[in-house]
C-alpha cells in the first residue's frame, strides 16, 4: 500500500539561496537565526527557555541539511544525532518567494512567469479596480489601500471599519490582495462574497491570491484574526502530481489546513479544516489512520509563517518548532512498510530579518520511510524534485520538472 504524507512547515527556511541577492535576502536563515537567538537567551518565553532543542527533527536530518545549506551547524541542534532518514536542501526555481509558487513547485509545477504585484506602499490599488469591486459589492468605500502588516492594520483601521462598514483592503510584497473584515459587524459570508468578487476582478492583474482575513474583538488592541481565513488562488498552470495521482491512479489527496485553497482545489479529493498547530497535527494523525492505498495526506502548518515569521516572533517560532518536534514521532509510529513521510517548507520567513516579508531560502527536504535509505540527498536544484519523486513513487506519468531522489 503506497501512501505519502507531506507536512509543510510554512516559512521554515534553512539558509539563503544563491539568488537571494535578487530579493534582498542575502544572509537570511530562518532556522539558523532562531537557533542563534535561543542560544543567546533572547528567545525565552512562557513556553520555552534556552537553546533550541529539536532532537527528533535532528534524527531525521534537519541539522545536517542546514549545515549543507549554510556551512554551519545551528547551535543547540544535535550534530551527532543518529540519522534515520534521508535529508537535503532544495533551491527554488520559481520566480517568487510566495506560498503558491512554493507549493506548486513542491507538486512539480514551478512558477516560471512573473506574478503581478501592487508595488506602491500607499495608494496601492488602481482606482478603476477598487471602483469595480465596490460597485459590484454594493459598498460606498473602503479603508487601507496600502502595504500593511496584517495585525497592525487591524489596530490602525479596525475600529473605523466597524463604525463605517467599509472593508480594509491591503497588500504586501507578495502577489496578494487582502481583505480584512469583522466577522460580527460585517459578516463572514459577506466577506467571502466580497473576496470572490475581487478574485474575478483581479483576473487581468495576474495576482496570485485574494485572502479573506476575518477578525473579531471589541476594539484596538483586542482584535484577533480568526481561523476562517480563506485563500482564493488561481489554478496551477499545468497538472500537479496531486492531479495526476487522482486522475491517472484514481487516488486520493487529503488537504489539511489551507492546502486546498493554495491549489485552487485542483487535485484535492477531501478537505479537512483545522486551525492552529495542535489541531492541524491531530487532524493529520486522524487522516493518516484513515488513509488507504494511493493516498497523499498533505498538511500546511501555516502558523509558523503567519503567527511567528511575519510577526518576527523568534520565541514563538522556536516554541512552535519544539512543539512540532515533540510530536513528530507520533506520525512515524503510524507509518506502514511502504509509506513515505516528507517534511519540507515553501519559502523562508526569517523572524530576525528586517521588515515582515518572506525570505528567499533553501527549504529542508527530510524524507522518512522504512524503505528509504538514510543519508544525504544533497542540494536539490528545485522544489519540484519532491513532485517528481512522488510521481515515480505512485507510478504516474512523469512531471516536466524535477528529479527523483529515491
UniProtKB/Swiss-Prot annotation:
What GO molecular function terms would the record report?
magnesium ion binding; manganese ion binding; phosphopentomutase activity
Q: Which cofactor does the UniProt annotation name?
A: Mn(2+)
Tell me the residue numbers annotated for binding Mn(2+) 2.
305, 310, 358
- Principal localisation: cytoplasm
| GO CC field | cytosol
Please list the GO biological process terms of this entry. Answer: 2-deoxyribose 1-phosphate catabolic process; 5-phosphoribose 1-diphosphate biosynthetic process; metabolic compound salvage; nucleotide metabolic process
Pathway-wise, it operates in:
Carbohydrate degradation; 2-deoxy-D-ribose 1-phosphate degradation; D-glyceraldehyde 3-phosphate and acetaldehyde from 2-deoxy-alpha-D-ribose 1-phosphate: step 1/2
E.C. numbers: 5.4.2.7
Tell me which domain of life the UniProt entry assigns to the organism this sequence originates from: Bacteria
Q: How is the cofactor bound?
A: Binds 2 manganese ions.
The residues that hold Mn(2+) 1 are 10, 346-347
Q: Where in the cell is it found?
A: Cytoplasm
The record, for InterPro entries, names: Alkaline_phosphatase_core_sf, DeoB, Metalloenzyme, Phosphopentomutase_DeoB_cap_sf
Reaction it catalyzes: 2-deoxy-alpha-D-ribose 1-phosphate = 2-deoxy-D-ribose 5-phosphate; alpha-D-ribose 1-phosphate = D-ribose 5-phosphate
Q: Which UniProt keywords apply?
A: Cytoplasm, Isomerase, Manganese, Metal-binding
**Free-text function comment from the UniProt entry:** Isomerase that catalyzes the conversion of deoxy-ribose 1-phosphate (dRib-1-P) and ribose 1-phosphate (Rib-1-P) to deoxy-ribose 5-phosphate (dRib-5-P) and ribose 5-phosphate (Rib-5-P), respectively.
Q: Which NCBIfam families match?
A: deoB, PRK05362.1
Which family would the database say this protein is a member of?
Belongs to the phosphopentomutase family.
Name of the protein in its database record: Phosphopentomutase
Species assigned in the record = Vibrio parahaemolyticus serotype O3:K6 (strain RIMD 2210633)
Amino acid at each position: 500500500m503506497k501512501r505519502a504524507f507531506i507536512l509543510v512547515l510554512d516559512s521554515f527556511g534553512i539558509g539563503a539561496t544563491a539568488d537571494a541577492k535578487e530579493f534582498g535576502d542575502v544572509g537570511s536563515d530562518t532556522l539558523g537565526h532562531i537557533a542563534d537567538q535561543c542560544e543567546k537567551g533572547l528567545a525565552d518565553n512562557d513556553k520555552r527557555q534556552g537553546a533550541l532543542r529539536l532532537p527528533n527533527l535532528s534524527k531525521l536530518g534537519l541539522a545536517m541539511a542546514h549545515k549543507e545549506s549554510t556551512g554551519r551547524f545551528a547551535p543547540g541542534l544535535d550534530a551527532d544525532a543518529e540519522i534515520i532518514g534521508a535529508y537535503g536542501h532544495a533551491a527554488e526555481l520559481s520566480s517568487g518567494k510566495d506560498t503558491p509558487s512554493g507549493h506548486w513547485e513542491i507538486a512539480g509545477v514551478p512558477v516560471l512567469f512573473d506574478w503581478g504585484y501592487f508595488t506602491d506602499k500607499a495608494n496601492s490599488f488602481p482606482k478603476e479596480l477598487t471602483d469595480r469591486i465596490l460597485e459590484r459589492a454594493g459598498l460606498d468605500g473602503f479603508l487601507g489601500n496600502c502595504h500593511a502588516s496584517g495585525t497592525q492594520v487591524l489596530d490602525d483601521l479596525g475600529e473605523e471599519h466597524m463604525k463605517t462598514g467599509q472593508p480594509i483592503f491591503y497588500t504586501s510584497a507578495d502577489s496578494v490582495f487582502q481583505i480584512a473584515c469583522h466577522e460580527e459587524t460585517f459578516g463572514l459570508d459577506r466577506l467571502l462574497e466580497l473576496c470572490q468578487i475581487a478574485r474575478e476582478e483581479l483576473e487581468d492583474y495576474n495576482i496570485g491570491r485574494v485572502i479573506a482575513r476575518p477578525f473579531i474583538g471589541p476594539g484596538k488592541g483586542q482584535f484577533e484574526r480568526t481561523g476562517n481565513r480563506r485563500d482564493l488562488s488561481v489554478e496551477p498552470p499545468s497538472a500537479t502530481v496531486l492531479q495526476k495521482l487522482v486522475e491517472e491512479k484514481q487516488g486520493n489527496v487529503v488537504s489539511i489546513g489551507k492546502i486546498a485553497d493554495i491549489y485552487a482545489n485542483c487535485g484535492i479529493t477531501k478537505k479537512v479544516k483545522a486551525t492552529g498547530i495542535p489541531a492541524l497535527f491531530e487532524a493529520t494523525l486522524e487522516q493518516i489512520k484513515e488513509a488507504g492505498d494511493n493516498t497523499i495526506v498533505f498538511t500546511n502548518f501555516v502558523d509558523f509563517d503567519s503567527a511567528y515569521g511575519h510577526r518576527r516572533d523568534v520565541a514563538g517560532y522556536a516554541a512552535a518548532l519544539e512543539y512540532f518536534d515533540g510530536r513528530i514521532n507520533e506520525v512515524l509510529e503510524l507509518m506502514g512498510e511502504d509509506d513515505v513521510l516528507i517534511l519540507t517548507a515553501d519559502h523562508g520567513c526569517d523572524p530576525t530579518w528586517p521588515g515582515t516579508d518572506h525570505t528567499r531560502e533553501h527549504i529542508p527536504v527530510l524524507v522518512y520511510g522504512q524503505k528509504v535509505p538514510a543519508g544525504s540527498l544533497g542540494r536539490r536544484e528545485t522544489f519540484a524534485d519532491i513532485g517528481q519523486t512522488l510521481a515515480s513513487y505512485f507510478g504516474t506519468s512523469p512531471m516536466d520538472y524535477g528529479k527523483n531522489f529515491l
